[in-house]
Amino acid sequence: IYEVFIMVSVNEFPIATANEIPGFKIIETKGFVYGLTVRSRGVGGQVSAGLRSLVGGEIKEYVSMMEDSRDEALERLIEHAKQVGGNAIVAVRFDSNDISNVMQEILAYGTAVVVEKEE
């Protein structure tokens, strides 16, 4: 099994899909944290996306909505980690679900930790 490592820094807050962050030592685990958002596709977007789906190709309205939703879920994840006293998040994952065929739920979750830079 290969472990994929991705690290982003949103406002200098280390976030990784791996269970550790290179260059940092985990000194305390704060626990499970998440960020959630639910977005409506809107009638106009549904109609244009429906028409576009007839001819195939990327549905740009949905791509934009999903990118915005992912960013919002990630920001909420960071806020939750800060609330529990974390300064980084490891083991980050995303999940998405349809709700009633008109809304999209995006969940970002992981483990809040306290890290310090290794010397």
Label each PLM-derived region with a short phrase.
Residues M7-G45, Q83-V84, Q104-E119:
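N-terminal presequence-like segments and the immediate start of the first folded domain
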Residues I1-I6:
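Short, Lys/Arg-enriched N-terminal segments with co-localized hydrophobic residues
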